Amino acid sequence: VYRIKNILVIVSFTFLFSCKKETENIVKVLPAQTLTDQSYGTDAAQKMDIYLPAGRSSDTTKLIIMIHGGAWVTGDKRDFAIFIPIIQQRLPSYAIANINYRLATNTSNHFPSQENDMKAAINFLLQQSGNYAISQKIVLLGASSGAHLATLQAYKYAEPKISAVVDFFGPVDMAALYNSTTIPFNRSIIEGLMNGTPTSNPLLFQQSSPLNFVTNQSSPTIIFHGDKDEVVPVAQSIALKDKLQSLGVTNQLFIYPNQGHDIWPDPIMTDAFNKTEAFIKSNVK
């Protein structure tokens, strides 16, 4: 009888322990979660929306940070909202952060305010990675001025190491952009952003140009540009591709014929997202 009781106790303990382990495993499967307008700084513009996938973990869940365009003076994270479901469908295991940043005016938020906001947003996400149950592997995806901020962050700063960059028609040489534009309004925007010209403020133009910070350690980069872009000439992306290539950095450049700046038809956007998905899967492990 004594032995039977002991066996029953052991069996009961084993059963309870097994149930406890199964319960713990169930608890660890986190549901999908969306957090809107999360502040990463004290300014009202320093906010982001965060999309966390189900089943995420600090070991396996990588992060895509999306940075909207708008010539550094306009635009909003809402501009990228249409692309969130597309990325979630293609890369379902990724978390996504869609960020706002301070926009420049003639009297405030001159560069490098936007660069500093990028750093602050990334640092916030890294600090909160444990709470969000995401890893510290980051992909930056930006369009136009947002792509400029993405490449500048990735190339200029060794830490944190950015895993990959997706660059939609972003400028990378600010002096060349200023000097080559045939649109007076664009020149005035750059003067307002930089609080000067390449002649009056050469150091800031140099320090704000991603092309100047490319090294053989730079992040893998995929670039998309239209050959009829009059806002950011395709020469900017060609120059970036040439420098990345010369230094042995993994890169791809796709130039779409007869396409301008910002608005591309659905078939081209689908092609770009196909290529983006493949590039990220290949280069971010």
State where each predicted segment sits:
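Mobile cap/lid helix-loop segments that gate and shape the active-site cleft of serine hydrolases
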Residues: A176-F213
